[in-house]
Every structure is written in structure tokens, then in C-alpha cells.
């Protein structure tokens, strides 16, 4: 008798849940942006590979904003520039939250990863700390260090062009290790701590892929014994690494020997900032995680574009010859006189965006757009790949055309933007340091070399890793020096 009662109660509960799902689906479907049909209960199947490309195809079919369902999760994907402005910028206050990320944030990161921290006081605390060290005035102080490392990048390409992607990783690691931890000696892409941090980033990227872990759709799985135990192991390994780096700075501070760094700033202001030791370690690690991964990828994309579009490369070099000449190397002081360099960088950002699929936002209130309603609680993805191919904003989007960023006077346009650093209140606080890195490396490498493809091994410009931040797969380049006595002129030897 008891078993019959229990069975009846469970059956009734299940029936009620199914009816609730059906009613919710019918109610929301009337107001949501359109989208591909899915299973009545489980919704749409997550894409197996390169979700941003799949979503771009759906944009062509369903329009600037479309809706997907994963279980009870509602996901609205934006694939056009104006829709991104209307929803994620004009409604930034209502769309700056992050959806719950159980696998990547709660299990792997103890809830401390800035990228996935929900809107609220904790996020404000984290961003205040980051902004103090990465705002434009602070970022400008890193230019001498970035310039030194950019010269080494050029010399590395001169001596060993076959490993140009590794040299980009070395540059990025050296810069962010200096900013984050005050490390002044050269950092190699093969240093153990760099390899371990990059391994952690790869694990994070895998956990962030849509549909990677069922726990993100059914959070109760988090409490099942043994579920995703490898994610907990990853967390302990990463926390041990970033804590070790932070403690090394503590020891130097205690001796009065610590150079300026973000970690030193956090330690000296820890009580005022109200951050725990674990939060401090993750904040410092965020500098490396965000800066190293994205900068290395962007440098690879820049050289790929130069090789594949020699006419665009030649335009930059003509201006470099006119403004700088070949008797000295370009510097940051030349930036205002080199709009062709800036335009080349901006087009590289657009042509192959590093954060191709973007990171999910979450609506905290209903957002009305073009007669549709994105309901509170829905996830919103600004798909950078599709937005970068908006033909109304970027005509002939598959072409690499830096000239689109210049006005009739040859100056950089103020009326054309791209959202490669994110949207609204979630824009990347490290964008100024990143822009500085891309400008000076592009200026120096195109001043120093004519970059071309290997005729025996043409570049596949769509061959990228299937990760949260995409990287070009290995490709061959030829670096032909344009400048005599390059090493002497750069005033530095390869390190």
C-alpha cells in the first residue's frame, strides 16, 4: 500500500513538472525571438564543434537574434551588431549578470573566477581591484616593458621564424608575468609555470563549451558523490599554482625586494579591498589567464593576416617608411602618426575574433527588443563571429580590409566599432594593455619584415582551435628582413 502511494505521488509530481514545462514553453514561445525547433522536453541539441560557426549559420536563417533551449535553459544568441548594441549595451544594467556556471566556476574555480562571477558586490569588488591597475593611466606605465618584449619578439622571428607562434606565446607570457607578478627576467613559453597555467586555461575552455557538462543544465548533479571528480582535481592543481605565485610575491614584499606588480598591490591593499587569500590568488591568475591567452592568439592572427593579404601589409609598410623610415624602429610615440597600423590591428580583431563565440550574459529583467521579449533569467550570447560578419556594418566581411577603419582623411574612424572586448559592464578591463601590445608588435614586425606564406604549405585561415579563446593552428611563414642591421638598431639581443 505504501509503495503504491509513493509511486502515485512521484507520478503526479512528474506529470505536474511536465505540464509546467509545456505551459512555460507555450507562454514564452509567443514572445521569444524565433529559433530552430527542438525536442519538447530536452530542447535543442548543443553543437558538437565550433558553436560560434553553427550559431552564425542560424543567424542567417532566423535573424539578428534567435532562441535556443537546453532543457529548461533559454539561450538567446545575438549575431548582428545593432542588436548587440540595443540589448547588451543599451540594456547593460539588465544584462551584465552571468548565468550560473556550475562546472567551470563553482566546481573548477570555487566561484572566484572573475570572468564568470555573477553581477553584484563581489564582482564590483573584483573589478575595482582590476581597474586600479589596468585603467589607461596605469596601462601606459607598462609601455617600456612591452616595447622591450616586442623587440625580442621581432628578433626571435628573425632567428627562428618557424616557431613564430611560440614566440608570440613567449611575448604574451613575459608581459603578463611582469604585470601580474613583477617578474623582470624573460619568460619562456616552455617555463613549467606557464605550461601549467596554459593547461588550466585549456581545461577551463573545455568546461565552458555549450553542453560540455550536464551539471550546467541539471545543477543537482553537483551533489552526486564522485560526479566530475576530475574538475575538483583541476581546481586543486590550479589553486596550488596561483597561490604559489602569490606567496612568492609575499615573500619578496616581506624582504622589501618586490618590484611593482598587480599581486603586490593586492597584498598591500588586501584588507582595504576586502579580499581573501583565495580571491587574491584568482585575481592575480586572471591577469595571466586573460592576458596571455588572448594576446598570443591575436599576434598569431595578425601575422596570418599580413601573409594572406600582402596589399594590406604593404600599405602599413609604406606609412612606416614615410613616418619612421628604416634608420630607427617605430615606438609608441609614433602611434598618432601611424593610423594604418591601428587600422590593421582593428581589422585583425574583426576578421578573426579571438573570443569568437563570446561569453554568456544573463538577463536580470525582461528585455524588450523589436517586439520580442528576452525574459529575466535567459542567457544571452553575443556571438562575436557572427557580429563581425554583419554585412550592413562591415561590407564584404570575409575580406581583410583595414581601410574600412579609416575616414577620407586617412584617420581612424570614430563611428565604427567592434565588440571584441565584450559588452557593456562586462567589457574586458585589460583592453588597454592588449591594444598597446597589438599596436607595438604590429608596428615593429611589419617594419622589420615582409611576411609571406610558404608556397608549399598555404595557410588555411579557418584552421583554429575549438576553444573558448581560439588560436590559429600551426602555419608556416617566411620572414624576409626589410631593415639592415636589425639587431643593432633594435638595441637588444635575443633573450
Curated annotation (Swiss-Prot):
Q: Name one GO molecular function term.
A: monooxygenase activity
Membrane-protein topology = Single-pass membrane protein
Which PROSITE patterns is this protein grouped with?
CYTOCHROME_P450
Q: Which residues are glycosylated?
A: 25, 198
Which residue ranges does UniProt annotate as crossing the membrane?
A: 2-22
Q: Which domain of life is it from?
A: Eukaryota
User: Is DNA damage found in the keyword set?
Assistant: no
Write out the pathway annotation from the protein's UniProt entry.
Answer: Secondary metabolite biosynthesis
GO CC annotation, single: membrane
Parts forming coiled coils: none
Residue sites binding heme per the record: 428
Q: Where in the cell is it found?
A: Membrane
Q: Which InterPro entries match?
A: Cyt_P450, Cyt_P450_CS, Cyt_P450_E_grp-I, Cyt_P450_sf, Cytochrome_P450_fung
Q: What is its EC number?
A: 1.-.-.-
Q: Which cofactor does it need?
A: heme
Give the CDD domains listed for this entry: CYP64-like
In the record, the note on similarity to other proteins reads: Belongs to the cytochrome P450 family.
Q: Its function?
A: Cytochrome P450 monooxygenase that is able to use 4-ethoxybenzoic acid as a substrate for oxidation.
Q: What is this protein called?
A: Cytochrome P450 monooxygenase 88
**Organism of derivation:** Postia placenta (strain ATCC 44394 / Madison 698-R)
